[in-house]
């Protein structure tokens, strides 16, 4: 595939323009978002949050749908923000460039960093034992792990990565934009851990930014941490893709990339195949 020439910016940071799949298109049916409250958690006692379920027009209860879970619900589902996942779902499902998918957008509690930056299976367990069963009680979702994905940006990005790392039996496809790996309490465990551990059955889309937080610092460098994770994935032969942009620690470039990320994550080749 030949990519058209695009003049690169001289002054940074840069902002990126959204493509047509990030805008509401005439003639494309729009899915619905349904809001729910979750006020009694066993995994995170005393916390409260909301979550939303996106249901595409093409959904049929007789045909179990693919599942994709997003952290930081508002950042990902608000079509006036940068990411606009529901609009991208509408356009790509309509064109059959991704499967019919139930999207679950979960708010963090007031303990966002404690939940998202932890290096354990607690958040994955919260999703798998609390939120997702509630969703599946109302909507037909496939039990095929190859059709379950998880996504997030910033701390929500490393949260998504960690959930898939601990539970690859459930989450197989990962979207991680500007992951805050440096905020994990004991430091970023993944570069060493990925190299030391047999490869897991994961397909991972990573986005990093050259002007991310502390990009020119030897410590707590978001860009460096994401590149180190990507390098380890490459060395172990993972089914992964890395896109590096010239933006900052915001949702702009990651949001612009979302349609291409979805197309790549949901391509039909078995996980592990390029």
PLM regions and their residue ranges:
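Non-catalytic cap/lid and distal C-terminal segments of serine-dependent acyl enzymes
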Residues: 1-274
């Amino acid at each position: 595939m030949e990519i058209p020439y695009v003049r690169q910016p001289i002054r940074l940071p840069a902002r990126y323009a959204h493509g047509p799949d990030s805008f509401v298109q005439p003639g494309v049916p729009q899915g619905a978002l349904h809001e729910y409250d979750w006020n009694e958690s066993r995994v995170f006692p005393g916390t409260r949050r909301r979550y939303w379920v996106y249901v595409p027009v093409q959904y049929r209860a007789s045909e179990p749908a693919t599942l994709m879970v997003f952290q930081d619900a508002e950042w990902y589902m608000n079509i006036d923000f940068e990411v606009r996942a529901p609009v991208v779902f509408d356009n790509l499902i309509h064109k059959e460039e991704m499967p019919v998918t139930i999207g679950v957008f979960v708010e963090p509690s007031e303990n966002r960093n404690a939940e998202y930056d932890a290096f354990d299976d607690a958040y994955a367990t919260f999703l798998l034992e609390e939120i997702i069963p509630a969703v599946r009680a109302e909507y037909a979702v496939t039990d095929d792990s190859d059709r379950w994905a998880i996504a997030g940006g910033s701390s929500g990005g490393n949260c998504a990565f960690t959930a898939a790392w601990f539970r690859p039996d459930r989450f197989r496809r990962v979207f991680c934009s500007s992951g805050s790996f440096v905020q994990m309490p004991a430091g970023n465990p993944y570069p060493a851990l990925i190299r030391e551990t047999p490869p897991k059955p994961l397909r991972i889309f990573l986005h990093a930014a050259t002007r991310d937080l502390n990009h020119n610092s030897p410590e707590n460098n978001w860009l460096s941490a994401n590149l180190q994770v990507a390098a380890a994935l490459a060395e172990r032969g993972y089914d992964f893709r890395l896109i590096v942009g010239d933006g900052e620690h915001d949702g702009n470039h990651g949001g612009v990339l979302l349609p291409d990320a979805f197309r790549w994550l949901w391509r039909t080749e078995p996980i592990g195949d390029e």
